[in-house]
A protein has these predicted regions:
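Active-site hotspot residues in diverse enzymes, especially metal/ion-binding acidic/histidine motifs
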Residues: 1-149
């Protein structure tokens, strides 16, 4: 039986190959998942299924060109592809700590999607703090990615 780690890697490889990009917004569009921005108070984003249509909702306070936007979309995309029938919120102050199985899997999906092997190679001589300063990604994301290599 396939482990969840292998399933996540396989899903990421499939969508990157089909879309030709690691952009979570482009992958969501390809997969028929809508993305909407709206006021969400202290929630950075959430995934929901409404009348068989999958939606990723992102806090309108997060600039669409920011690394945080990519991280939140990638995390929620992980939920959409791995946990289709679950409604999942990503708290703005969330530190990517492994709070539950489905959150760990969504975090792992985001890390695998946004930090490919060639990026790890490019930054191999850097500390995780330097990596984060260069990419804008949270430290927890690189920690998750290197844990599941």
């Amino acid at each position: 039986m396939e482990t969840i780690d292998h399933k996540i890697c396989r899903l990421v490889r499939y969508y990157v190959r089909m879309v030709g990009s690691r952009d979570p917004v482009a992958i969501a569009k390809f997969a028929g998942i809508g993305i909407a921005t709206m006021p969400l108070s202290n929630v950075a984003g959430y995934y929901t299924l409404v009348q068989r249509k999958r939606w990723i909702c992102i806090n309108e306070d997060i600039p669409s060109d920011s690394p945080l936007f990519k991280v939140v979309v990638a995390h929620e995309l992980g939920h959409a592809l791995l946990h289709r029938k679950e409604n999942c919120a990503f708290i703005r102050k969330h530190t990517l700590l492994l709070t539950s199985g489905i959150e760990r899997e969504a975090n792992q999906f985001a890390a695998e999607l946004l930090i490919p092997d060639d990026m790890l190679q490019e930054y191999s001589g850097c500390t995780s703090d330097q990596f984060c300063a260069c990419t804008g990604y949270p430290k927890e994301l690189i920690d998750i990615r290197t844990k599941y290599m």
